[in-house]
Amino acid sequence: MSWLEVFIHAPFKEDVEEAKEESDKNAVSIVLQFAFSLKGKPDITKMLVGGDAEHQVWQHILDNNQDGEKLAWDVFQTPHHCSWTFFNDTEDKEHVLQSAEDILSKKRDDDGLIIASSNEIKNEKPNPPHYEAKVEYKKRLKRKSNFLNTAIHCIENDISQPIVLVVTDSGVQDRTANMSEKEAKGFAEALKSGALKIAKTGALSLSVGKAIAASGGFYGKE
């Protein structure tokens, strides 16, 4: 028996009501926590997905949060394609706001993964992705290799492949390069049905038994 619990942190009603311009769209981005349970073991893996939320949204979430476990994570998806706006919205690439420190400190153990769903992160323009953001994220990881970039993590025939994370009773595992036949079949069916889509930079995928969550979508019967 496996199940998925989804907690919606944002957008907030007042932010939606105040958003009038195209430039306001990041203020109403969806921020979610996925909590995966398996075989009677609750919350084996938690994933925090930040959409395009900038630091103001994260501060709003922190100000209103009443349960720290709803912000805990084993997998963190970098907001806004690894944009610096999670840390600060100025040109000062050395000043990290407390909101970013607080969210990143919610990592549950040393095996946490941070995933940038973005183009390859280079120390050059245009951006995002911001190279400085990548540097800050990696500072928070004991294993620097646990920072994954969808554009380059797995490439076959010059095409970025989806990052596939499998949740087992011992936690989350990166199975990008060695999906089982059953998992590959389920993934292919999800793509065929249109439930999942792969961008040119690759997609972020999670599977629990037959279930696969990718880029905020959920596929499966369990």
PLM features: what roles do these ranges have?
Residues 12-110, 114-125:
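Active-site-proximal loop/helix segments of hydrolase catalytic cores
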Residues 1-47, 119-222:
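Flexible, acidic/histidine-containing loops and adjacent segments that form or flank the divalent-metal
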